[in-house]
Amino acid sequence: MTLQDRFSLAGQAALVTGGAKGIGAAISATLAEAGATVTIADLDTVEGEALAGRLGGHFIRLDVTDFDACAAVAQRITPDVLVANAGIVHNAPTKEVDPSDWRRVIDVNLSGVFNTLRAFGPAMVARGSGACVCTSSMCGEVSVWPQPQAAYNAAKAGVNLLVKSTAVEWARSGVRVNAIAPGYTATELTLAGRSKPEWFEVWMDRTPMGRLGEPREIADSVLFLCSAAASFITGTVLTVDGGYTAL
C-alpha cells in the first residue's frame, strides 16, 4: 500500500455529526476530498444541504441528543468512518450556571457522542471494521482561562474517557475509536471570545504558536485518525492546540 493509499478513503462511507459548519464542515470536506462519500448529520438544514451538494454527499437532519433518532438513521446507514463532532459551548461561572444550561451542554457534547457511538457502533462491530473519531477539546484535559465554562470542560473530559473505554471494548472487533482535542480554532464557536480582547489576548499569550488553529488543520488530523495510516491507533486523544497544553 502506497503512502497515498494509506490516507485514501476511496470507496468508504463517512457520517459526520455537526458536519455543516465550522470544524465539522472542514471535516466533511476533507473526508470527501480523501474519497469518502460523506453524509452530513446536522440540525442546520440550509448549511448542511448546501455543503452536502457541493461535496457530492448526503444530508440528514439529526438531533444527536435524541437516541431514537440516531438509531433510526443507523438502520439505514452503516458508515466505515463515523465522526461524532456535534457540540455547543456555554460560558457562565459555576455558581451562576442554570441547571437547564448545564444539562443542555452535557446532552449535546457528551450524551450526543454516546448516542452516536451507541447507535452506529454495533453494526460496525458486527461487520468487523470501522474508524470512529469523536471531537473533544483541550478543555477536556486542562481548565482554561479567563472564560468560565465548567459544563463544557466537564463534558469534554467525559468524552475522553468514553472514547478510551469504548476503544478498549471494540479493539478486537476491528473498530478503532479515537478523539481529537482542538485548541482555540477560528470558528463561530470562538467568535465571542475572539471579540473580547481581555479573553483573546490571554488565549494567544498561553498558546506557544501564538495563533488560532484553522479548521482545516483539525480536519487533517481527523483524516489521519480515520485512515489506514492510523491502523494501530485506538483509544487515543490527539491534541491539536498549538502547544497550549504543553505549558
Where are these regions (language model features)?
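Active-site helix of classical SDR
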Residues: 117, 155, 163
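Residue(s) in the substrate-gating loop at a strand-loop-helix junction
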Residues: 137
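Alpha-helical segment proximal to the catalytic Tyr-Lys
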Residues: 122, 168-169, 231
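The beta1-alpha1 cofactor-binding region of Rossmann-like NAD(H)/NADP(H)-dependent oxidoreductases
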Residues: 45-46, 62-72, 99, 216-217
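Substrate-binding pocket helix/loop in short-chain dehydrogenase/reductase
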Residues: 93-94, 98-106, 199, 203
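C-terminal substrate-recognition "lid" of short-chain dehydrogenase/reductases
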Residues: 114, 211-240, 245-246
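Short, small/polar-rich loop/turn modules that mediate ligand/substrate recognition or access, typified
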Residues: 171, 176, 233-235
